Amino acid sequence: MRTSAVTLPLELSDVSLRAGNKRVIKDLSCRFTNRPGCSVIIGPNGAGKSMLLKLCHGLVAPDAGRITWAGGSDPGRRGQYQAMVLQRPVLLRRSVNANMVFALKSKELSPGERDHQVADALARAGLSRYAKTPARRLSVGEQQRLALARAWAVRPELLLLDEPSANLDPAATHLIEEIIQEAAEQGSKIVMTTHDLNQARRLADEVLFLHRGRLKEQAAAADFFAGPRNDLAQAFLRGELLWWRRRSIYTPDDNRKDS
C-alpha cells in the first residue's frame, strides 16, 4: 500500500455555488483526509452530489468560500494528484490502449513502465482482450470500466467517481466495485456519489449526506447506517423523504430551517 500522501487533505470551507439563479451548493464545509478508503456521497436527486465532486476537482469554481488542497487553492495543483470519472465518461475515439496511454502522458514514465501500468490497469478492469478495440465499440459497462481503469492508471491520491455504476447490470456493477475496492486497498482515497444505498453500505468507510445543496451529516459509515443524527437523513434511509417534505417542515427559500 502506498504511504500516506503529503498533499491531502482536501478541505471545503463555507463553499457556495450558483447554477443560473439557483444556489446548488450552500455554505458547505467538509474535509477529506489522506486515509485510504471510500467516502460515499448520498442524497436525493438535486442534492448537489455531482456538483460537489466537480468543485473538488476544480472543474467549477465556487461563488463563495474556499477550497484548499494541503493548504493551497490552485486547482491546477489539485489536478496533479487527482483523477475524476464522470457519470458519462469522455473517451477518445481511438483504441482502448490509446485511451490508457493518453492518460499517462503527463507522467514521467519510461516506455516500459508505461506499458506495464497500462497492462496492469486493463487486466484489473477485465479489458485486456479489448486493448486494440476502438473504445466506441465497447458496451456501456465496458466503457465505464475503461474510464475507471484510465483514471486509476495514473495512481491518483484522490479518485473522484460520479455514479460509477449508474445504469449498469449487476455483473458490471460488481466489476466496478471490485476496482474501487482495490484502488482503495492500494492507497487511493475514493470519493464517489451513488443513489444505491446498498452499494454505499458495501463500499463506504465514510458517508456524507447532502440535501438541497447542504451537507447535513458526515459520519463513519457504520455510525451513519446504524442511525443518522439528522432527521432528514433518517427519513432518506427509510425511503420517507418525499413524505417528510410534504409535511412542510421547512419553507421553500434558501433560509429555511431544515433539520
Task: Report the location of each language-model feature.
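Conserved ABC ATPase signature
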Residues: P134-L138, E142
